[in-house]
Amino acid sequence: MSSLREIILDTETTGLDPRQGHRIVEIGAIEMVNKVLTGRNFHFYINPERDMPFEAYRIHGISGEFLKDKPLFHTIADDFLEFISDSKLIIHNAPFDIKFLNHELSLLKRTDIKLLELANTIDTLVMARSIFPGSKYNLDALCKRFKVDNSGRQLHGALKDAALLAEVYVELMGGRQSAFKMVDKSAVINNLATNQVNNKTEQTTIVIKPTKEELQKHKEFLSRILKTAY
């Protein structure tokens, strides 16, 4: 049986439209194999080489001053592309993130880099609209519907929102009991502290039904992401 690798991905930006000069300021991506979080992630804050509009700052709390010493996109592009590889991307409102990522990639002017394809994404916003017509579909509303603890989400954040989306996605696919197995999350937590990408480490997936203890460990893991993502 072949493994299904998926990447839960989110970005934060300086605004709504890259055609108006807006840029990505944070990328958070979490690896899932056969609906199991492996503990591997990619997370970087990025210097957008421009100011931070107050409207965007109010949403994610990332200031221009904070981003001054952060890497430029071109310095992390290869690591990012290696991490996502050709895996399916799970994104909430995928067209938004894909247009920004492709804008950043196009600015590199490299013939060896292909732009990302929207066809290679699963849009959880579209899924939610199909399953729950007439309801609210933002991440907070879906967390509330599925009883996912998002109490630490006062502001948006790419990595912590990707972690929440991972839970929501599993619920949209049928729920924890049918798909969500637990693994050790220490690698993710360590990466949060060091802002490093760990895309070389192989980890063993434990294929079992989640016990109450494992589900509690997952809640604790999610809580730590929400508290330490900034």
UniProtKB/Swiss-Prot annotation:
Cofactor: Mg(2+); Mn(2+)
Keyword annotations: DNA replication, DNA-directed DNA polymerase, Exonuclease, Hydrolase, Magnesium, Manganese, Metal-binding, Nuclease, Nucleotidyltransferase, Transferase
GO cellular component, one term: cytosol
Annotated source species: Rickettsia conorii (strain ATCC VR-613 / Malish 7)
Active site per the UniProt annotation: 156 (proton acceptor)
GO biological process: DNA replication proofreading
Gene3D superfamilies: Ribonuclease H-like superfamily/Ribonuclease H
Keyword hit for ATP-binding: no
Protein's recorded name: DNA polymerase III subunit epsilon
Sequence positions that bind a divalent metal cation 1: 10, 12, 161
Binding-site list for substrate: 10, 12, 55, 60, 161
Pfam families xrefs: RNase_T
Cofactor mode of binding and number, as noted: Binds 2 divalent metal cations. Magnesium or manganese.
Presence of keyword Translocase: no
Complex and partners: DNA polymerase III contains a core (composed of alpha, epsilon and theta chains) that associates with a tau subunit. This core dimerizes to form the POLIII' complex. PolIII' associates with the gamma complex (composed of gamma, delta, delta', psi and chi chains) and with the beta chain to form the complete DNA polymerase III complex.
Catalytic activity entry: DNA(n) + a 2'-deoxyribonucleoside 5'-triphosphate = DNA(n+1) + diphosphate
